[in-house]
Amino acid sequence: MPGRFELKPTLEKVWHAPDNFRFMDPLPPMHRRGIIIAAIVLVVGFLLPSDDTPNAPVVTREAQLDIQSQSQPPTEEQLRAQLVTPQNDPDQVAPVAPEPIQEGQPEEQPQTTQTQPFQPDSGIDNQWRSYRVEPGKTMAQLFRDHGLPATDVYAMAQVEGAGKPLSNLQNGQMVKIRQNASGVVTGLTIDTGNNQQVLFTRQPDGSFIRAR
């Protein structure tokens, strides 16, 4: 048939067409023909018609029944059930009425405590302690031995006066030191014999004076 013989030369030309493509010279003939076939398949795939109809949403039977039940008007039995008044619940507790406030009741008066006046402890404040002078001891050493500040002795030495009783201590002399509750030296007496004593007292400014 003439049509068959005309188609065969055309197919042969198409089959050998890749041999004339210079940019495919590095590839073997079979690879060239494979590339041409793949290109033809892609073109045919693009040209085929596609199904553009959107997928219709699937409505379940339950959704249809819900829509139908909502669209129907309520029956008389449903309306009667809504109009029935609820019965009292026995579990509900009735509100408790507040107790009335009785007038005339005396208010509770707070208890008052009597505060006692401050009484200073005379047994601790201004307490005198007696010390006997040992051989070779000075007044400053006597203070140090009993944990008292020697600076008080130096302050009293500035007003020592006649006879210098602080500097001329004798063995066996009796010395009395007075301290307040805080342990501060507030007075000092030295027995000078013949029932006579020398007295030093502290002033409010911290200095000492010889009282007698």
From Swiss-Prot:
Organism annotation: Escherichia coli (strain K12)
Consequence of gene disruption: Deletion of the gene has no discernible impact on morphology or cell size. YtfB/dedD double mutant grows as filamentous cells.
Any GO CC annotation of this UniProt entry: plasma membrane
Compartment annotation: Cell inner membrane
Region (OapA): 117-212
Name assigned to this protein: Cell division protein YtfB
Note on domains (UniProt): The OapA domain binds peptidoglycan.
Compositionally biased intervals (Low complexity): 99-120
Keyword vocabulary terms for this entry: Cell cycle, Cell division, Cell inner membrane, Cell membrane, Membrane, Transmembrane, Transmembrane helix
Topological category with respect to the lipid bilayer: Single-pass membrane protein
Key word Acetylation present: no
Entry's Gene Ontology BP terms: FtsZ-dependent cytokinesis
Role this protein plays: Cell division protein whose function is related to the generation of a transient cell wall structure. Function is linked to the late stages of cell division.
UniProt GO MF annotations: metalloendopeptidase activity; peptidoglycan binding
Keyword Cell division on entry: yes
Recorded superkingdom: Bacteria
InterPro entries: LysM_Opacity-associatedA, OapA_N
Chief location: membrane
More about this protein: Overproduction causes cells to filament, most likely by disrupting FtsZ ring assembly.
Region (Disordered): 88-127
Family membership noted in the UniProt record: Belongs to the OapA family.
